[in-house]
Structures are given as C-alpha cells and as structure tokens.
Design a protein with these regions (language model features):
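A short, terminal or domain-edge coil/loop segment
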Residues: 150-164, 182-190, 224-232
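Flexible hinge/switch segments at interdomain interfaces of large molecular machines
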Residues: 177-185, 241
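N-terminal secretory signal peptides that target proteins for export/translocation
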Residues: 1-23
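Bacterial N-terminal signal peptides
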Residues: 25-39
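Catalytic-core regions of hydrolytic enzymes
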Residues: 44-180, 195-207, 211, 263, ...
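Active-site-adjacent mobile loop/cap segments within catalytic or ligand-binding domains
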Residues: 68, 187-271
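Short, intrinsically disordered, low-complexity terminal segments
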Residues: 11, 41-43
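Compositionally biased regions
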Residues: 18-20, 28, 40, 240
C-alpha cells in the first residue's frame, strides 16, 4: 500500500512489535459468539435442505478513496472491480437461479464491516472477496485463496496486514474493529464454531477456486491458506478471499489488467 497518512494505534498493528493486532476483547467475545451461533445455525440449516446456492455475494476489494495496492500503471481497485463484475456475469449466465449481489459495482468506498453486513443481511450462501497481492520483492507471483483463520506464518500475516489496512480509510475504524485478534486465546472459541459450521465449506470453495485458477487461468498455485482478514471474520456463511496475483510483479500486472486475463480469472472463480 502506498497510502498511509494516518497510522493505526499500536494495538492495531503490534503483537510483540511486529504483527498486526486487533484484539478480541473480553467485552466483545461473548456478543460476537452469540451472534455467530444464531446466525450460522440459521444459514447452515438453509444450506443443508437441498445444497443449492441461491445467493452469492461478490466483493470487489478496495474502491473509491482506497486504491488498494499499486502496480506501475494500475490500481488494485480497478482490477478487482472488473473481475468481480465478470464473475457475476458468468454466474448469472450459467446459473440463472442464483442471485448475485455485489458489495460495490462501481468505484466507491465501502467499509470492510459493511461488506460482511451486505452478505449477512441478504442471507448469502457464499461470500467471495477478490483482491490482488503485492510484495516489496517484485519476483513473487501466483494466485492464492484464503479462509478466515490464524496467522500461521509471517507471509500470511503480511497479506492480511495489506488487506486489513483498508480500515485506515474508515472514520470509525477504532471502535468498529475493537476486539479483533485472530491469535488471541479467546478467539479459539470463535474459530472452533467456525470450523464446525462452515470452515470445511470455505476450504472446499477455496480449493476449487485454486484448482480453476491454475487450470483455466494458468496461474501458479500458491495454495489455500488461512489468515485473519477483517472482511471475512463477520461473514456468516462459507467465505474466501482470493488473491488473483501479484500486482507488484510486472508480468502479472500486465495479465491482471488485460481483458483476456480478467476474463480467464473471472471464469475460473465462477466455475
């Protein structure tokens, strides 16, 4: 990210002075747990009746005043929007009975928590958040798909930090996300429920997307991973965050911004 005029408080960034931290405070964990139990049980029952996917929410990362990661010639927000809209078009064409909802369908800013709210209020069966990766090293390449979980590696943490930095554009981010720490002991309660209710479906969705990105879009497969993404932790359905490729890599940037590349990426996700 090239924008950072405001800095997050230390509790938002530092765990032993290095890791991104948004703490699951004791005051928050119980209401969140209760909310998730009731919300997820309802959604799980709906999915178990016939297994049909009736509503999919497609989330184009960043937007408006938040450009996302910057390539040499294009901002992440433009790529994610183009691909997200194409994903929706493919789903509508091939699965006319499935309703597609976008968290944004033009270049405007949407807070991370509102993206999850859109999915929850519409009782979505799937939530797919679309992003582009970036690295200080321009040699990194490939696609990877994340599910909500613990920061099991420094690399996963860095990706989460990159995407979570979108909160810097939100006026009330300190109060809105106070209490979020995927690595806090209290979080095990939430992740335990997550695993029992829809983590398995999220992993299955992520695995399918990765396979298709490799087969259809010829993307190097960086695998299915988990990390603490703010945009995922409030969703009450199977949800994934897709990193299409590295916008910091010139070759991948050229593919990501090309019409042909976007068509292939969208088709892979929609499959």
């Amino acid at each position: 990210m090239r924008v950072r005029k405001r800095k997050l408080p230390k509790k938002f960034w530092a765990f032993k002075s290095k890791n991104l931290i948004l703490t699951f405070g004791k005051s928050l964990i119980l209401p969140v747990v209760v909310f998730v139990i009731f919300s997820l049980n309802g959604n799980a029952l709906a999915l178990s009746k016939d297994g049909k996917i009736r509503t999919v929410v497609i989330d184009a990362g960043h937007g408006g005043k938040d450009p996302g990661a910057m390539g040499k010639t294009i901002a992440e927000k433009r790529i994610t929007l183009a691909v997200a809209l194409k994903v929706g078009e493919y789903i509508t064409k091939n699965h006319p009975d499935t309703k597609v909802i976008y968290t944004r369908n033009d270049d405007h800013f949407v807070e991370l928590y509102r993206r999850a709210d859109i999915a929850n209020k519409n009782k979505a069966d799937l939530f797919i958040s679309i992003h582009c990766n970036a690295s200080k090293s321009r040699i990194h390449y490939g696609a990877e798909t994340f599910v909500m979980g613990l920061h099991r590696s420094q690399a996963n943490l860095e990706v989460a930090k990159l995407e979570n930095a979108a909160v810097l554009y939100e006026d009330n981010y300190q109060s809105q996300y106070d209490g979020f720490d995927p690595n806090a002991p209290e979080a095990e309660i939430l992740f335990s429920m997550y695993q029992n209710l829809y983590r398995r479906q999220s992993l299955l969705l992520a695995s399918n997307i990765q396979n298709q990105l490799n087969a259809v879009a010829s993307r190097f497969d960086r695998g299915v991973k988990e990390a603490g993404f703010l945009v995922l932790y409030r969703t009450t359905m199977p949800s994934v965050l897709v990193e299409l490729g590295f916008i910091s890599n010139e070759n991948e940037e050229n593919f990501l911004k090309s019409k042909a590349g976007q068509e292939k990426l969208a088709l892979a996700i929609a499959n």
